[in-house]
């Protein structure tokens, strides 16, 4: 079975502009494989092809790509989900971030927005526990669906609001994490966290397009978390 690819290529050291390059690969009839497996095989043929990868298990978030127009992880996306009769599999870097080379993007702006929400527990220490900050099961359960984010950036780079305001809008990944700490019973800085997001851009640039929900490889729902943050901000200002 012949597999045909059209892959984004750009090496700033030698290229004046990006280009799409065609590749072919012979797939084993009756057997599927992940896109990352195909990319590794293509790199064996063309060592100049650049992309990120690490765990190959959908855990590290390194290999986020745009595949046939939709963001996802190459390591858990089967080729069978991308093949269409008479069409090439089109692979591009995650949109909205500067391209370093080929499919490798500069994640600096994504991480900068994530750091703004202070993604760690803040506790004033006024009531220090004897051993640790305990949580009831129902308190811990509230964090499910919030802490599992692997920072692959698939959500933020599929969001038009992040494309338009990458230095002002925190983005789906950052806001999902922000809500996780806002409702954590061990965190005492809810008010200061909300104050840091009370401007017109940080949260309210989300227009509930829900691209982030559509592409999240972990099945998380940043839009819902952002909606809760909006409600908290509105209640705070009332």
Curated annotation (Swiss-Prot):
Residues 139-169 form the 4Fe-4S ferredoxin-type domain. One of its GO terms (molecular function) is electron transfer activity. Binds 1 [2Fe-2S] cluster. Binds 1 [3Fe-4S] cluster. It holds the Pfam family Fer2_3. Keywords: 2Fe-2S, 3Fe-4S, 4Fe-4S, Electron transport, Iron, Iron-sulfur, Metal-binding, Oxidoreductase, Transport, Tricarboxylic acid cycle. It catalyses: a quinone + succinate = fumarate + a quinol. Belongs to the succinate dehydrogenase/fumarate reductase iron-sulfur protein family. [4Fe-4S] cluster binds at residues 149, 152, 155, 216. Part of an enzyme complex containing four subunits: a flavoprotein, an iron-sulfur, cytochrome b-556, and a hydrophobic anchor protein. One of its GO terms (biological process) is tricarboxylic acid cycle. Its EC number is 1.3.5.1. Residues 1-97 form the 2Fe-2S ferredoxin-type domain. A ubiquinone binds at residue 164. Coiled coil: none annotated. [3Fe-4S] cluster binds at residues 159, 206, 212. NCBIfam families: dhsB, PRK05950.1. Pathway: Carbohydrate metabolism; tricarboxylic acid cycle; fumarate from succinate (bacterial route): step 1/1. [2Fe-2S] cluster binds at residues 55, 60, 75. This is Succinate dehydrogenase iron-sulfur subunit. Its cofactor is [2Fe-2S] cluster; [3Fe-4S] cluster; [4Fe-4S] cluster. The keyword Cell inner membrane does not apply. Two distinct, membrane-bound, FAD-containing enzymes are responsible for the catalysis of fumarate and succinate interconversion; the fumarate reductase is used in anaerobic growth, and the succinate dehydrogenase is used in aerobic growth.
């Amino acid at each position: 079975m012949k597999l045909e690819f059209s892959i984004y290529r750009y090496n700033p050291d030698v290229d004046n502009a990006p280009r799409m390059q065609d590749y072919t690969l012979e797939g084993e009839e009756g057997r599927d494989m992940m896109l990352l497996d195909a990319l590794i095989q293509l790199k064996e043929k063309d060592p100049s092809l650049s992309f990120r990868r690490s765990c190959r298990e959908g855990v590290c978030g390194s290999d986020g790509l745009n595949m046939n127009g939709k963001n996802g992880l190459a390591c858990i996306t089967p080729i069978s989900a991308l093949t269409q009769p008479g069409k090439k599999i089109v692979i591009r870097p995650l949109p909205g971030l500067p391209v370093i080379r080929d499919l490798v993007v500069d994640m600096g702006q994504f991480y900068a927005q994530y750091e703004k929400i202070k993604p760690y527990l803040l506790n004033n220490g006024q009531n220090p526990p004897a051993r640790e900050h305990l949580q009831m099961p129902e308190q811990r359960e509230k964090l499910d669906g919030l802490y599992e984010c692997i920072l692959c950036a698939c959500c933020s780079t599929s969001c038009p609001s992040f494309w338009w305001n990458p230095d002002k809008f925190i983005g789906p990944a950052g806001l999902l994490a922000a809500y996780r700490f806002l409702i954590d019973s061990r965190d005492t800085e809810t008010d200061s966290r909300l104050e840091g997001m009370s401007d017109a851009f940080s949260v309210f640039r989300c227009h509930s397009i829900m691209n982030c929900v559509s592409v999240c490889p972990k099945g998380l729902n940043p839009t819902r978390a952002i909606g809760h943050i909006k409600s908290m901000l509105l209640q705070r200002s009332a």
